[in-house]
């Protein structure tokens, strides 16, 4: 049974871990801010030593299709269509106004951003569905530019899902450095308005 001392100890342990994470992430953000693409490339090479660029090429995306089973490809296409339909229904309700009192009108209007960034987990937590669930709503909302970051090595299925979902740029970057790159921008990654 948990008592007050156990709770205090548990909170103190978590606070210590959080403080360590803050220091680590601050260092990563600073490295991306100062080192740009070079810092990103160095971090990516820890997981994929032969990487020469953080940007995934169109040839790599095309090659990924050849590595994905036809049934899986059909499943991704079907999932994209279903997710699209769901979010189209939401979009139909993206503007509403209601007069709550005479002369007082409340409402909501949804307006797409110009450029968004998506973080798609990888390695042991690689779920290509995350690519669809993040990119399709943005596409349906009318966001004209999407970039995605996913840690190396990237599963072919993830690349195919990102392509099916309409993502314009894919970068082999994971973790805090991916979020920093999308937020701050680098020599080759233009900053986004929302991640």
Q: Which residues are covered by each model-predicted region?
A:
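Short acidic/polar active-site loop segments enriched in Thr and Asp
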Residues: 36, 144, 168
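Predominant activation on well-ordered alpha-helical scaffold segments within soluble catalytic domains
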Residues: 26, 41, 80, 84, ...
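Structured loop/turn residues at beta-strand edges in well-structured enzyme cores
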Residues: 23, 111-114, 141, 165, ...
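Active-site-proximal helix-loop elements at catalytic-domain edges
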Residues: 1-8, 159-170
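Conserved small-residue-rich beta-alpha loop and adjacent elements
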Residues: 97-161
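N-terminal Rossmann-like NAD(P)+-binding subdomain of aldehyde/semialdehyde dehydrogenases
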Residues: 1-114
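Conserved NAD(P)+-binding/catalytic subdomain of aldehyde/semialdehyde dehydrogenases
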Residues: 166-195
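Mid-sequence acidic-hydrophobic segments that form the walls
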Residues: 82, 86-93, 119-122, 141, ...
């Amino acid at each position: 049974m948990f008592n007050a001392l156990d709770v205090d100890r548990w909170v103190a342990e978590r606070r210590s871990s959080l403080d360590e994470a803050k220091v680590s992430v601050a260092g990563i953000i600073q490295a991306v801010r100062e080192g740009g693409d070079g810092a990103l490339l160095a971090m990516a090479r820890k997981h994929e030593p032969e990487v020469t660029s953080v940007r995934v090429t169109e040839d790599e995306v095309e090659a990924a299709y050849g590595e994905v089973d036809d049934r899986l490809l059909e499943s991704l296409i079907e999932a994209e269509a279903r997710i699209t339909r769901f979010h189209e229904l939401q979009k139909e309700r993206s503007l509403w106004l209601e007069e709550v009192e005479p002369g007082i009108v409340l409402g909501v209007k949804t307006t797409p951003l110009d450029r968004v960034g998506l973080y798609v987990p990888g390695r042991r937590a690689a779920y290509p569905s995350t690519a669809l669930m993040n990119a399709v709503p943005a596409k349906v909302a009318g966001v004209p530019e999407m970039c995605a970051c996913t840690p190396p090595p990237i599963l072919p299925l993830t690349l195919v899902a990102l392509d099916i979902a309409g993502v314009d740029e894919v970068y082999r970057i994971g973790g805090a450095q991916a979020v920093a790159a999308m937020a701050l921008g680098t020599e080759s990654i233009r900053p986004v308005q929302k991640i």
